[in-house]
Amino acid sequence: AIFVRCSSSWFFARITPTVFYNVHMNHDEAFLGNNCPVTYFVPNYYYEFFYRPQACGIKVEILQEVILLKTKLKYVSRNSTVRAEIPLMCVFRK
């Protein structure tokens, strides 16, 4: 599961350790955008990312009525060459 929220001053994502095809990943194998690490975690339950929109290579798109923040969630296995990505987006009103 993935939960995403944002505002003009922060981007928040909470993920479960099995978000990538039920492969269990450790907190140090999950990254936001340009390799920003997990900022808080409860082992085996969830991992959180909490960053400013200017960090981690988060892209900001200004649309007519809303602001769109775009980034990605990355899995980089420590024990193999397995890599995976999921795009993340969040919208808020101007």
Which role fits each region the language model picked out?
Residues 3, 7-94:
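Beta-strand-rich globular domains of non-transmembrane regions
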